[in-house]
């Protein structure tokens, strides 16, 4: 196997091992030694691939958001395949958000932990919130936003609905975060 392919596989093993441990036990409670052991590597290998625990936490957070979004979208697409109105698709999106957090309560805890995660001064400009909002400002609300717009177009949603306010309230409800200042 080529060295670069092995390196990429090892990086993914570390990310997946760390993700599982971070979600089940928390970031602070999980050491690099434990992650390395779970990934079948040495702690030095983990540091060689990521440099710092903060950099690993960032890579894991990005990957977790992708995994969350892809899983959510697959379940949402299945849920809406026979629905006709934007209103019904919006309700389905909200039901899927709710179902996701009920089915995966550890995701909610992990999200809260990551939004309050403080990097070390050596981490530089790593901004965990920014990574989260890249997804929650775009990918995550897309099904609901699109459904609301379709609902306005098909008459199943009132045309005077403030869609931005609706999406903000929905995001707040499903993330447990109040971002109004």
What is each model feature region?
Residues 66, 70-73, 119-154, 164-168:
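Amphipathic alpha-helical packing segments from all-alpha helical-bundle domains
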Residues 1-9:
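N-terminal intrinsically disordered/low-complexity leader segments
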Residues 10-19, 35, 60-64, 68, ...:
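Generic hydrophobic, amphipathic alpha-helix propensity
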Residues 59, 74-106, 163-170:
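Hydrophobic alpha-helical connector segments
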Residues 100-127, 180:
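Amphipathic alpha-helical segments used for helix-helix packing
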Residues 2, 13, 21-59:
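Helix-turn-helix
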Residues 108-113, 130, 152-181:
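Hydrophobic/aromatic-rich alpha-helical bundle segments in the mid-to-C-terminal region
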Residues 24-28, 104, 154:
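Short coil/turn segments at alpha/beta junctions that flank glycine-rich nucleotide-binding fingerprints
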């Amino acid at each position: 196997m080529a060295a670069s392919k092995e390196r990429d596989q090892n990086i993914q093993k570390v990310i997946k091992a760390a993700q599982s441990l971070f979600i089940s036990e928390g970031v602070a409670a999980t050491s690099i030694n434990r992650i390395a052991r779970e990934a079948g590597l040495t702690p030095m290998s983990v540091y060689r691939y990521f440099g710092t625990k903060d950099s690993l936490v960032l890579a894991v957070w990005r990957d977790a958001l992708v995994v969350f979004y892809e899983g959510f979208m697959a379940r949402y697409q299945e849920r809406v395949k026979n629905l006709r109105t934007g209103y019904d698709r919006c309700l389905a999106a909200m039901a899927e958000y709710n179902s996701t957090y009920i089915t995966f309560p550890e995701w909610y805890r992990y999200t809260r932990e990551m939004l309050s995660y403080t990097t070390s001064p050596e981490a530089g400009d790593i901004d965990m919130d920014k990574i989260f909002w890249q997804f929650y400002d775009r990918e995550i609300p897309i099904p609901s936003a699109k459904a609301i717009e379709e609902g306005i177009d098909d008459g199943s949603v009132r045309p005077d609905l403030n869609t931005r306010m609706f999406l903000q309230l929905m995001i707040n409800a499903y993330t447990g975060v109040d971002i109004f200042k």
